[in-house]
């Protein structure tokens, strides 16, 4: 007697999954350029959260820190220690860059997991983490590439390019290729992990909308934090490597 309703529910779940679309974007025309509006919206939300948190952190600091001040100081110390471990004693100027990368990616990843997808209706596509878009992750990876080239050239001048023929000129093509594989690996690792996590949650919510997706969502939060840490650690390691001149 209950076979037909169960079959209908199963078919409905499969139909909901068939509606999950990848690569659907809501576009804005800005100055003759076509931009992904949902990426800009969520990026602005992330930037607003970070700027608001920074304003709160520096407002009225106490000699005896409050719980909130302790939290912000812990975050700063964590970023400083991460940068120092990878870059070395000349880490100071790079703390803002590595910190910005880590915090932007961390909050972006969490925004995709915590921000209700249906709370804002868009003509096409849905809100998602900025790091769910390959354009964002490629831009972050290219910024990292510019940063480690700048670090190497600032430290060594034109002598920085001598690393391409070390330890032997035979490795010149491989060393040049490495400069292309670094941003590729950074961008695709971050993009793939965040996209896969959000798709898994969407599919599970379509099938079993109550209890089952919750553990996966918590796992996604953990994975999102790990991906931000990996990106920031590798960015700092590349900068330190360019300044030291060894692999």
Curated annotation (Swiss-Prot):
User: How the protein sits in the membrane?
Assistant: Multi-pass membrane protein
Where found in the cell? Plastid, Chloroplast thylakoid membrane
Q: Which cysteines are joined by disulfide bonds?
A: none
| Main localisation | plastid
Q: Which GO terms describe its cellular component?
A: chloroplast thylakoid membrane; plasma membrane; proton-transporting ATP synthase complex
Q: Which UniProt keywords apply?
A: ATP synthesis, CF(0), Chloroplast, Hydrogen ion transport, Ion transport, Membrane, Plastid, Thylakoid, Transmembrane, Transmembrane helix, Transport
Task: Offer one Pfam family short name for this entry.
Answer: ATP-synt_A
Endpoints of the signal sequence = none
Q: Does the keyword Transmembrane helix apply?
A: yes
Q: Does the keyword Transport apply?
A: yes
The protein's matches in InterPro entries, at most eight in alphabetical order, are given as: ATP_syn_F0_a_bact/chloroplast, ATP_synth_F0_asu, ATP_synth_F0_asu_AS, F0_ATP_A_sf
Query: Where are its TM segments located?
Result: 38-58, 95-115, 134-154, 199-219, 220-240
Task: Give GO MF terms, alphabetically.
Answer: proton-transporting ATP synthase activity, rotational mechanism
- PANTHER family the UniProt entry points to: ATP SYNTHASE SUBUNIT A, CHLOROPLASTIC
Q: Which family does it belong to?
A: Belongs to the ATPase A chain family.
Q: Per its database record, what is this protein's job?
A: Key component of the proton channel; it plays a direct role in the translocation of protons across the membrane.
Q: Which HAMAP family match?
A: ATP_synth_a_bact
Record note on quaternary structure: F-type ATPases have 2 components, CF(1) - the catalytic core - and CF(0) - the membrane proton channel. CF(1) has five subunits: alpha(3), beta(3), gamma(1), delta(1), epsilon(1). CF(0) has four main subunits: a, b, b' and c.
Q: Per its record, how is this protein called by name?
A: ATP synthase subunit a, chloroplastic
Organism, by scientific name, is Calycanthus floridus var. glaucus
This protein's encoding gene: atpI
